[in-house]
């Protein structure tokens, strides 16, 4: 054992590099959820002795992690009071019919909101709003949703509180220099990059983004091609199904079929249907492919009626799938959902939510068969049919997002001014350095609970636990890199290789390397790896470390070229009906513009030479 400990001590840098490579591979291949991978990395570091047990679990009590937890809760408290909806209603009327004017207006609404609230929360609020906006103004939603995501990303860089990456970077900076970033230290650079990015979006989006998905007529049946796989079958006199309940018949388990409704003597019976006894003459509205319909006809003696006649687009509904009791709606799987990685069959989705999935949209792909065997992913868009009260229940979950506007009577509008005052006090007190943001943010949480803006039980559901576990696992990796000398080794190599370059060139290279890395890793993982290296390179070359840390922080968050580089990109991937290449088409030029502009702006605002 002593020999093993000695060997491990002698090879700390190679071992740390091996763990980094392992983490990179696991993040890219996604064999495990990234938050699980991060915790696994922390465990490996402790087992190898690269961090002590205390250091290995320190991520859970790190000031950045604690602050981010509080900011999730404060963001949720703000959204529960309907403030964003109030701002939306007061400004949306100025949108007009010009697409560029609408993009500019959306940027002005979303950007400042993202500066203080969680980005994913902003997109979750605005997704159904933008869809309805597109429908009313006869615009393809594909022209608006990537700009929505980009605007939240850019707006999140205006203040320290805008993203978890900013707060994590501040925690790393405090560890390296003894002082973290102040709340508004990002603001001069953030406002400029936001302005540059918004101008690009307004000019380029109408040209570069295709009209992939048009929901202007509201005809869900036509968009999802429901007519091709929703049919009516009737139970004839000699069918073996007569006298059995739907559960006993096992037709939904044995065949790729979902029964959406049973019609008995002209009376429509919605879900739940499992214990409904089937009788002669019953008509079943089913989701099924032709092959399965023919199989059930042969084996169970049913008859297939003529294709379901869906109503015209002018009626703005899905025909027989919708009624006064039932409806059809799209539901988005969010990043913290327990559904991710599971199949509908494993989840017993129909029984759990009292609704049936009749199609899945994944980007441009439309999945309509063998739905029970499809492993669900973050960003999948489910087309659900079920009782209207089931959707009211779905609107309260934090794992799924129903893409329709929530009624204002579900919000605590009377607490809006109180919530604004609480968040303003949190920002002012922390901004004046009276108390650390980790303290003021939790004081704000308690104030929201005491004032009734939040209920105590809502605190736990408001926290994005996947992000918290990701941070808790990544922070020990940064510690291991420092303890083992890996950060210093990287910095020495880069300083020797780039010592002859100008300050602008070095900043540009760090921005580019970080921006490319964040497209395949999470932005938090990228900042943990790159920020300490950038800091030590700056110190080695006698340059301003703050400039290098800001370049890395901004580059880590500005992920525009893929739907997987940033969570808000993934959230709009399905609803926009995008292809993977759509993000590269509009995101690559924006990345180039910011790669050239951000280092220059950093030099002008903060200087590349140390200020002493």
From Swiss-Prot:
Q: Where are the transmembrane segments?
A: 13-33, 38-58, 67-87, 107-127, 144-164, 189-209, 419-439, 459-479, 501-521, 525-545, 546-566, 586-606
The name under which this protein is listed is Uncharacterized transporter sll0640
The way it spans or sits in the membrane comes to: Multi-pass membrane protein
User: RCK C-terminal domain: from which residue to which, for each copy?
Assistant: 218-302, 316-403
Annotated family: Belongs to the SLC13A/DASS transporter (TC 2.A.47) family. NADC subfamily.
Record GO terms (molecular function): monoatomic cation transmembrane transporter activity
Gene Ontology process terms (BP): potassium ion transport
Q: What are the alphabetically sorted keywords of the record?
A: Cell membrane, Membrane, Repeat, Transmembrane, Transmembrane helix, Transport
Species source reads Synechocystis sp. (strain ATCC 27184 / PCC 6803 / Kazusa)
InterPro entries reported for this sequence: Cit_transptr-like_dom, DASS-Related_Transporters, Na/sul_symport_CS, RCK_C, RCK_C_sf
Tell me which stretches of the chain form a coiled coil: none
Task: Report the domain of life of the source organism.
Answer: Bacteria
Disulfide pairs here are none
Which is a Gene Ontology cellular component entry for this protein?
A: plasma membrane
What SUPFAM superfamilies does the entry give? TrkA C-terminal domain-like
Where can this protein be found? Cell membrane
């Amino acid at each position: 054992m002593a020999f093993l400990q000695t060997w491990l001590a002698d090879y700390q840098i190679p071992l740390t590099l091996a763990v980094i490579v392992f983490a990179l591979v696991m993040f890219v291949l996604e064999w495990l959820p990234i938050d699980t991978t991060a915790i696994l990395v922390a465990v490996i570091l402790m087992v190898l002795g690269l961090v002590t047990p205390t250091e290995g679990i320190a991520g859970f009590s790190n000031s950045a992690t604690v602050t981010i937890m509080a900011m999730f809760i404060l963001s949720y408290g703000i959204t529960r009071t309907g403030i964003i909806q109030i701002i939306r209603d007061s400004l949306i009327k100025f949108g007009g019919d010009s697409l560029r004017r609408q993009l500019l207006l959306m940027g002005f609404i979303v950007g400042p909101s993202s500066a203080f609230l969680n980005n994913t929360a902003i997109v979750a609020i605005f997704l159904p709003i933008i869809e309805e906006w597109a429908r009313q103004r006869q615009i393809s939603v594909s022209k608006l949703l990537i700009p929505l995501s980009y605007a939240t990303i850019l707006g999140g860089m205006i203040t320290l509180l805008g993203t978890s990456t900013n707060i994590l970077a501040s925690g790393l900076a405090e560890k390296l220099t003894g002082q973290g970033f102040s709340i508004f230290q990002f603001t001069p650079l953030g406002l400029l990059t936001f302005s540059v990015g918004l101008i690009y979006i307004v000019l380029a989006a109408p040209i570069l983004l295709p009209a992939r998905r048009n929901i202007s007529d509201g005809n869900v049946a036509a968009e999802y091609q429901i007519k091709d796989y929703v049919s009516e079958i009737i139970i004839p006199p000699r069918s073996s199904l007569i006298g059995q309940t739907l559960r006993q018949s096992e037709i939904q388990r044995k065949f790729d079929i979902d029964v959406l409704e049973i019609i008995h003597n002209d009376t429509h019976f919605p879900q739940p249907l499992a214990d409904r006894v089937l009788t002669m003459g019953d008509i079943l509205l089913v989701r099924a492919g032709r092959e399965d319909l023919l199989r059930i006809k042969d084996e169970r003696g049913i008859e297939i009626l003529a294709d379901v006649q869906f109503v015209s687009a002018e009626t703005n509904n899905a025909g027989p799938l919708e009624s006064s009791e039932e409806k059809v709606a799209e539901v988005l799987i969010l990043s913290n959902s327990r559904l991710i990685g599971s199949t509908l069959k494993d989840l017993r989705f129909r029984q759990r939510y009292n609704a049936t999935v009749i199609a899945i949209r994944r980007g441009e792909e439309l999945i309509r068969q063998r739905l029970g065997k499809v492993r669900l992913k973050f960003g999948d868009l489910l087309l659900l049919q079920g009782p209207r009260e089931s959707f009211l229940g779905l609107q309260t979950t934090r794992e799924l997002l129903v893409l329709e506007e929530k009624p204002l009577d579900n919000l605590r509008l009377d607490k809006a001014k109180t919530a604004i005052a609480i968040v303003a006090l949190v920002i002012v007190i922390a901004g004046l350095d009276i108390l650390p943001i980790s303290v003021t943010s939790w004081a704000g949480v308690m104030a929201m609970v005491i004032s009734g803006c939040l209920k105590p039980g809502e605190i736990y559901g408001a926290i994005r636990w996947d992000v918290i576990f990701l941070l808790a696992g990544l922070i020990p990796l940064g510690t291991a890199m420092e303890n083992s000398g890996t950060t210093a080794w990287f910095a020495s190599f880069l300083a020797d290789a780039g010592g002859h370059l100008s300050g602008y060139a070095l900043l540009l290279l760090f921005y580019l390397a970080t921006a490319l890395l964040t497209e395949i890793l999470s932005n938090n993982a990228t900042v943990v790896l790159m920020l300490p290296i950038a800091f030590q390179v700056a110190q080695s070359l006698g340059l301003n470390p703050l400039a290098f840390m800001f370049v890395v922080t901004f580059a880590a968050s500005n992920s525009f070229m893929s739907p997987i580089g940033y969570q808000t990109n993934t959230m709009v991937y399905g609803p926009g009906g995008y292809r993977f290449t759509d993000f590269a088409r509009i995101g690559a030029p924006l990345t180039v513009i910011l790669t050239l502009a951000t280092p220059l702006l950093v030099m002008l605002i903060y200087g590349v030479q140390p200020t002493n």
